Amino acid sequence: MRRSSRPGSASSSRKHTPNFFSENSSMSITSEDSKGLRSAEPGPGEPEGRRARGPSCGEPALSAGVPGGTTWAGSSQQKPAPRSHNWQTACGAATVRGGASEPTGSPVVSEEPLDLLPTLDLRQEMPPPRVFKSFLSLLFQGLSVLLSLAGDVLVSMYREVCSIRFLFTAVSLLSLFLSAFWLGLLYLVSPLENEPKEMLTLSEYHERVRSQGQQLQQLQAELDKLHKEVSTVRAANSERVAKLVFQRLNEDFVRKPDYALSSVGASIDLQKTSHDYADRNTAYFWNRFSFWNYARPPTVILEPHVFPGNCWAFEGDQGQVVIQLPGRVQLSDITLQHPPPSVEHTGGANSAPRDFAVFGLQVYDETEVSLGKFTFDVEKSEIQTFHLQNDPPAAFPKVKIQILSNWGHPRFTCLYRVRAHGVRTSEGAEGSAQGPH
């Protein structure tokens, strides 16, 4: 601000502008070149730290302030009014500190007023320098680096802990396996300790193997010998065994002589025997009722060979057959044989005889003597023997078997084998062996 000149002073009425600058800035406020003011910038050869002068050698720029004092521009503090000076003397003699002397007659600011400039206050109100910001950024960067390093250390420590756990688990499993293996060895070694301590040499081992091989060869030779002996015995006894088998088959466990065999002289009286069953369709007859492709004669009942279909069939469920015995026989039993239902091709035994009667016949007068009535049960054994009612015993040259019914077949009845048991008498005793009339 402009200040009025003091009375009696020859100061110019020019406008004064104070030159304030910061230590961080090399530029200062300059005066107006149009008014002939001197620039506040340091001249050539002038030190940089030289303080700026006012526009004239008069007073520094002041502003109206509180009464009784003056206020420096740019400062909020109130300063007392300076003491009066001889401006000419001061301007002629005073020089700026650290600079060249001014020409005579130009006002120069003394050091004492310069000390009164509010330089310190201006510096305190300046914004913080950029160095502080750089320091903060460096501090934050350092903290971030430290945090990243700490995180890496923690991750590495976690990995180490995991690897240590894995190693501990592996070592535990390995120790358990070794313990089990050791216990197994102890269990196996303990029986071996009870064996003889002496170990066999290789030659002794070969000798034992050789001796055992010889023993095996001897056993094989004995087995071959026994096999040959058994074969010889079988060959020698084959005929005997066959005879025994056929004998048992012929006897059929009856163990009684059979006088109704064609091989001992028995025959069929065809005149007194029923007619054979004649079927027009022999193929149907064979396939359905398991017969041969032709009708069997009644002599088949005198043969020892009994198998399904090898029988004598007569028409209907009633018929008779008369057997001529090889001599006079005191009859005691009659045996009938019929295959069981399980082996019949027709799946049943309904053609078997059921109720029948036995008669003894004399040769001369053809007198019939009843020897009893009986029933053949197909559910029982296939061979059934019936005891005759011949008391007192009488000898007969013929015997008649009369079939009264069968087991349900509507067209025919089959008779397989008939046996006559008793005692054969001599010709001299023929007259005394007469049965009742």
Curated annotation (Swiss-Prot):
Give the UniProt subcellular location, in the record's own words: Membrane; Cytoplasm, Cytoskeleton; Cytoplasm, Cytoskeleton, Flagellum axoneme; Nucleus envelope
Disordered: region residues: 1-88
Segment forming the signal sequence:
none
What sections of the sequence does the record tag as coiled-coil? Answer: 197-244
Query: Which Cys pairs are S-S linked?
Result: none
List, alphabetically, the Pfam families matched: Sad1_UNC
Topological relation to the membrane, as annotated: Multi-pass membrane protein
Subunit structure of this chain's protein: Homodimer. Interacts with ODF1. May associate with microtubules. Interacts with SUN3 and SYNE1; suggesting the formation of a spermatogenesis-specific LINC complex; a SUN domain-based heterotrimer with SUN3 may associate with SYNE1. Interacts with SEPT12 and LMNB1; during spermatogenesis.
Query: What is the annotated role of this protein in its UniProt record?
Result: Involved in spermatogenesis. Required for sperm head formation but not required to establish and maintain general polarity of the sperm head. Required for anchoring and organization of the manchette. Required for targeting of SUN3 and probably SYNE1 through a probable SUN1:SYNE3 LINC complex to the nuclear envelope and involved in accurate posterior sperm head localization of the complex. May anchor SUN3 the nuclear envelope. Involved in maintenance of the nuclear envelope integrity. May assist the organization and assembly of outer dense fibers (ODFs), a specific structure of the sperm tail.
Return the protein name.
Sperm-associated antigen 4 protein
